[in-house]
Structure formats: structure tokens, C-alpha cells
Amino acid sequence: MRNHCIASHFLPPILIILLGILISSPIVLCSEEYTENSQAQVSAKGANGFRLITPANLGGQVYLEVWDEDDCLVKFKIWARADAQEKAKKFTDMVELELDREEEVVNLKLTTPHPAPWEGSNYGINATLYIFIPHNFTVETKTQAFDLDITGPITKIDIQNQYGNILVSDISEETSITATYGQVDVENVRGSLNVETSYNSISVRNVDTKDEKALLKTSYGKIDVERFEGQLEASTVYSPIDASDITLIDGKNEFKTVYSKIDLDITEMKDAQLYVQNTYGNVNLVVPEDLSARLKFTVGRGGKIITRGIIIRPTVLNQTSLEGICGKEESEIEVDINGIGQIQLEGK
């Protein structure tokens, strides 16, 4: 009988390492999958809110949008993988969907056993929800490991999500998003906006706070703002902030980061206060050439302050600071760089 084993000295070293990993790892080499589809529907006539709750040991995707009916409709797909199809089906049977009505709120809840047999294993399970609700509802979610894609028109939304990305659009009054390790994208929002995540980015577009305020906070993630009007506070660390086409109105606005850069392109300022803080990073400001504001710029030793395309009447000017007046002092801009960095102010 011929020996079909391959001598190790004929294999590249990297292949030997990979084979060793495959042999030593508890991988499900023969896996079977099972998928089940279902749907549920409940009357939402007279209701004004929707609430979603999912367990910690189940992840997937949620797609929520509005429709013209007076019902809430949920289309549900559950997928599982195990070493046998019978076991995979057993996993899907363990996930229960409950859709009911409690006075003015429609509740959708997914439940699973705890602990579940797929936890800590190489088995897999994933849920996909397609949710349809009436126009101008309020929405509340408490999820983990779900990616959320939510489109209005919705009046108010309150999202709490861990380990998943979030996309929200078309909110008319109030938006509150608390995430962990998830990217957050928000667009077409009116009213107050509060977004907090960590170790990922925040992007907001086409926002008007309507006499309210927007608060954007992350760490180790970039903040992007485009087409904004109102009051804005944005903070991150070790990552840049880029805001363009922004109008700052009646109140305090703050931008903070460290060891990165801040780029602000301001279309208009109306009786607003702008405070920018950075550490060992540059700050670039583009403002209207007819800006009316009091300026105060400070950098650390070795830093630079550059201005162009705008008329400033200086009151203090030295190697590390510039104070001055543009126009009638209707607004205030203060920029402080702790350590070496450059402030550049450009009129357009």
C-alpha cells in the first residue's frame, strides 16, 4: 500500500504553521445550516410608540422603516449553523419572537435561553428583522451585536446598542443614541441630537437642532459633520474632527480632540461662542470674510498662528497668542492648542 502522507520537509514553513493551527483549533469541520422565516403583525391604531428589546446572546440585523398602514409588521429570519442540521434547527426553535401591544406602545421582544448552547462554541446564529411601523412614531431600542438601519419619518428615537453599527435618518424632534464599539451615521435630523459611542466614528449630515443642541462624543474615532445648523459640541481623542458647511447659532459650541487635527468650515456665525481645544495637533478654521467676532488664539511654544483673507484688528500679538476683533464682535472664537501645533484662520 502506498503511503499518501506528505513529508513535512516538502511543505513551506507557513503552511506547516497553518496546519498546526487547524488541527489544534476546535473548529466545526462539518457544519450544517438551517434557516427559518416567519412574520408577526399587530394593530397599531391609536398607538404612538415602538419598542425593541433583544437578548445579549443573539445578534444580527434590524431594518426598520415606516409605511402607510395602521399595523406593525415584523418579518423575521433566523439562521443557525451547527455540526448537524437537526441541532441547527433546535437552535432556531430556541429563539422566540413576541409582538404585542401595551396601551400606546407596540413591543417587540426576542428571547433566548441563558446560557444558550451556541455560546462559547464555534456554532453560529443570526437574526434578521424587517420592521414596518406607522409614520411619526417614537422608537426605542435596547440591543446588542445588532446592526441597525432605521428610516423615518420618526418623531423621537432612543437607541442603546453595543457591538453593532447604527444608521438613522429622518427624525423630526429628538435623537438619542448610545453605542459601544459601533459606528454611528445620522442624517436628516431636526431637534436635539445626542450621540455617544467609543472606538468608532460618528458621522452626521443635514442637521438642524431648532434651538436645541447636538452633542457628539466618541473616543479613538473620527467625527464628521456636514450641513449643520444650531449649537454643537463634539469631542474625541486621538482622532480628527472634520466639520463643513456649519452654521453656529446663539450659544456655546465646542470641539475637542488630542494628537490629531480639527478642520472647521463655518458658513455663518450668529451670536455664537466657539471654543476649540487641541493637544499637539493643528486647527484649521475657514470663516466668512465678513465675520463679526472677537478672537483669542493660543498655541504652545514652537506653535504657529497663520491668518489670511480676513481683516483682524489685533489687541494682543506675540509668538504664541493672537487676540483681536473682526467686525462688530457679535460672536466669539477661542482656540487653544496645548503643545506644538498650528492655528490657521482663513476668510472665504
Feature-to-residue mapping (PLM):
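Intrinsically disordered, low-complexity terminal regions
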Residues: 2-348
